[in-house]
Amino acid sequence: MGATGVLLCVVLHFLQMVTQSSEKFTVTGLQRPVLAPLGGNVELSCQLSPPQQAQHMEIRWFRNRYREPVYLYRNGKDLHGETISKYVERTELLKDDIGKGKVTLRIFKLTADDDGSYHCVFKVGEFYEEHITEIKVTATSSVMYILMQPPNIKGVMLECHSGGWFPQPHMEWRDNKGNIIPATSKAHSQDENKLFNMTMTLLIEASSHRSITCYLQNLLTHQEESISIVLSGELFSWKRVWIMILTTIGFMMIAFCMTYCVQQHLLYGTFSKGKCHWLKSTMIFMFSVIAVTGVMLILHLKQRVPVSDQHFELDTLWLEDISVILCVLIVFIIKLISFIYFRLEGDHQGWSLPPYLSATPTAAICRLAVPEYSRGHLQLDSEDDLAGMGPSPFFITPCF
């Protein structure tokens, strides 16, 4: 055997040793997720164990279970053509320690879409090992604002808005003592950059909470942001004013009715139906007010649309409009009923008999309504004159 044969045997033996050693390795790296801010840079390292030469190996970085190649190193070259386009200009493989089996993937300008798991794969021939590292992209926004809807029949509606969070933050209402107030509704959406826009509402039905704070927290970094609003007690005074107005109107109606009827009693000695016309109209008015007020209360107290529904505000405005329309209808209907009632009452009054006939049986049980002569003068001197009139177009109605 010559020198060439000896050299060939040495090379083959060396390659065999390299192959055997290469088939006996594992890949290690970071065990905890890597927290990285939105728009920042991150480095992911992986290491062969035991440490060994890795220049002759194929090194790949994948996402989503090998479906998205992030970086490829093979035969000592970086192959950008086999990676997805969004990582071509934003990734770099640091190979300073590749002789010891360590490489580092650097990703620039992180986006919310970069959040997830990354597979680091070392491959020699058909043998390969991998390590999985997770990136947690975080974003916190200080842009917050509270919108207050105009007070309505349900109360005061507060809306807290904040955008630009990742991942989805924890959101809640708190009072001035730090106690949690249950939110009426919560909603979120994601923009084209996959950042979360948060919305939370709170319906305050009483003035017990004067200072309200909207509180958000990033659950990964525990960073907090908050904004507060102080509510004036005047926002809830409209309820007391409304109750006082209705109470005052009710007492005024009762007082007017009693005063008028007492006056009629003092003047005529009895509460005759012919004298207390205003009592009848007042009763009609009170009945109408009670009926319509009852309908309004039923509409207001009945829960038709949940507060969390997007049509809640429209439903509230509809109730307010209906309330105004009902009040206008009350006034119109009462005016119309009163006009028709007193007009008909005046048309059917007719004429009454002379005083000296009031004790006679005929005059005591009837009232003569004479349409043809109601605007003239009819003279009756005695009951015989009444009996001698014979048939006539008189309408006999009971006396009241």
UniProtKB/Swiss-Prot annotation:
GO CC, any one term: membrane
Protein keywords: Disulfide bond, Glycoprotein, Immunoglobulin domain, Membrane, Repeat, Signal, Transmembrane, Transmembrane helix
Protein's membrane topology: Multi-pass membrane protein
Residue positions with a glycan: 197
Summary of the tissues where the protein is detected: Expressed in skin, thymus and mammary gland.
GO biological process, one term: T cell activation
Domain (Ig-like C1-type) ranges: 139-225
Main location: membrane
Record topology, Extracellular segments: 22-240, 302-321
InterPro entries attached to this UniProt entry: BTN3A2-like_Ig-C, Ig-like_dom, Ig-like_dom_sf, Ig-like_fold, Ig_sub, Ig_V-set, IgSF_BTN/MOG
SUPFAM superfamilies, A to Z: Immunoglobulin (SSF48726)
Annotated compartments: Membrane
Every Ig-like V-type domain range: 23-133
Membrane-traversing stretches: 241-261, 281-301, 322-342
Disulfide partners: 46-120, 160-214
PANTHER family named among the record's database cross-references: BUTYROPHILIN, SELECTION AND UPKEEP OF INTRAEPITHELIAL T-CELLS PROTEIN 2-RELATED
Function text: May act by engaging a cell surface molecule on immature T-cells in the embryonic thymus.
Miscellaneous comment as given in the Swiss-Prot or TrEMBL entry: Encoded by one of the 11 copies of Skint genes clustered in the D1 region of the chromosome 4.
Record protein name field: Selection and upkeep of intraepithelial T-cells protein 2
Native source organism of the sequence: Mus musculus (Mouse)
